[in-house]
């Protein structure tokens, strides 16, 4: 019995040690920064940037890695201090609950081993989160709420139009105040339950992508196996999202789901991070026809800043993507993604 107790003690010590070192290592491998700071910026560009009244970004997975977002980090790009340094007023923090092994842009199986499970365990999260997508969602929601609470009025959890208007008003005189919204990448997080949709709404979620990198109960992913449209359950979810006031994010949806959503939604959509086929002809990116339908819906398109969406070299292609959307429908439909 004594040896068993010692063995359990050693294992416990090893586990808690792993929670300190493994998540940062995984983030360093999976979420690398291509160009390290300091960055060279022309004085003219800096002047233009400083004149911008309100900067927002529609996509950030920083909650996934277990970092304290109230502290300036050394990994990734985003936390509250670096938002302030960059004059970013509003960030959409998105929750990732499942990632298939061998994740790629072309075809992924929903039955593949889930990469997020070992990360969840390594982060030292509650065993209730280890194998539950909805619990992972609520845990990350609570994390964001906690970070905002720690800011003692210097951060606003944006859950409504009134919250956004308050943020804009406050930032007109105090740029140190920042805002955060909450989204979900892939409605598989709902685990097939409409009741869970109401649950995540109460937790502060205001944007959900029907699919992420694989097909689910709502329909087909742009990177899945069947490229199908909305299922009956998918249509129920879209209807309920409209009723609640949750933005529909089409960033990873199959073309069929994009068409189905635009045909039935009663509210403007978002495409949080994406490119266009005219610049990079990938199955994920938007055609001119889709761009026009999104604009007609009153939606916005977040241009992604990475090679899988815009191709390489990235910066010229980001500019080309922005210009293309501008030329097709107008600058007012473009956002940062």
What are these regions (language model features)?
Residues 273, 336-337:
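A generic structural motif
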Residues 2-209, 213-225, 281-291, 295-302, ...:
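N-terminal hydrophobic targeting/anchoring segments and the immediately downstream early-domain regions
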Residues 210-212, 217-290, 302-311:
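Active-site core of metal-dependent hydrolases
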């Amino acid at each position: 019995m004594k040896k068993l107790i010692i063995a359990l003690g050693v294992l416990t010590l090893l586990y808690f040690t792993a929670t300190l070192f493994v998540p940062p290592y995984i983030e360093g491998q999976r979420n690398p920064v291509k160009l390290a700071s300091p960055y060279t910026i022309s004085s003219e560009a800096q002047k233009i940037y400083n004149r911008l009244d309100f900067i927002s970004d529609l996509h950030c997975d920083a909650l996934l890695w277990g970092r304290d977002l109230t502290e300036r980090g050394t990994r990734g790009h985003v936390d509250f201090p670096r938002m302030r340094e960059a004059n970013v007023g509003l960030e959409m923090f998105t929750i990732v609950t499942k990632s298939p092994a061998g994740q790629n842009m072309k075809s992924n199986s929903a039955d593949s081993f889930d990469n997020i499970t070992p990360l969840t365990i390594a982060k030292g999260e509650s065993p209730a989160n280890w194998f539950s997508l909805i619990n992972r969602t609520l845990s990350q929601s609570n994390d964001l709420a906690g970070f905002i609470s720690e800011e003692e009025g210097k951060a606003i959890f944006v859950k409504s139009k009134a919250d956004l208007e308050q943020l804009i008003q406050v930032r007109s005189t105090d740029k140190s105040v920042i805002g955060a919204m909450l989204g979900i990448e892939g409605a598989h997080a709902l685990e097939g339950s409409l009741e869970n949709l109401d649950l995540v709404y109460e937790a502060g979620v205001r944007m959900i992508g029907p699919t992420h990198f694989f097909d689910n109960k709502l329909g087909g992913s742009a990177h899945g196996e069947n490229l199908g449209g909305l299922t009956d359950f998918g249509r129920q979810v879209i209807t309920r999202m409209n009723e609640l006031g949750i933005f529909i994010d089409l960033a990873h949806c199959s073309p069929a789901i994009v068409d189905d959503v635009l045909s039935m939604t009663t509210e403007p959509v978002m495409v949080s991070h994406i490119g266009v086929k005219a610049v990079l002809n990938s199955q994920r990116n938007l055609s001119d026809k889709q761009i026009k339908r999104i604009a007609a819906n009153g939606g916005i398109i977040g241009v992604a800043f990475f090679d899988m969406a815009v191709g390489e070299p990235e910066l010229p292609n980001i500019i080309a993507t922005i210009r293309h959307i501008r030329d097709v429908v107008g600058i007012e439909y473009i956002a940062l993604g």
